[in-house]
Amino acid sequence: MSERHAVCNESDIPENGKYAAFVEDEEVLIVKSEGRLYAIRDCCSHQEFPLSHGSVKGKVIKCKAHGAEFDLETGRALCAPAHVPIDVFPLEVIDGVIYVELD
């Protein structure tokens, strides 16, 4: 069963910003881009480099290590060298607090 966990306040993340945190031993990255929030596992599926070091444009995050790109909504790998998707987590904002659901 999924559990909802508070990660941070929405105001902690500037537009086009990122917020990395450990939630129940899971490395979670919250991304705010174009007014939307996304929650992903903070780990590139190519060589496990932290995606929090990468760049964001629209709904795409690019790994700083080797240039792999992922769709923030679906986790789908968009280009080599990554072929495996990243984990995405459901999130919701309640009274300004961002919560993620982990399995």
Description of each model-found segment:
Residues M1-G58, D71-L72, R76, P85-D103:
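N-terminal pre-ligand scaffold of iron-sulfur
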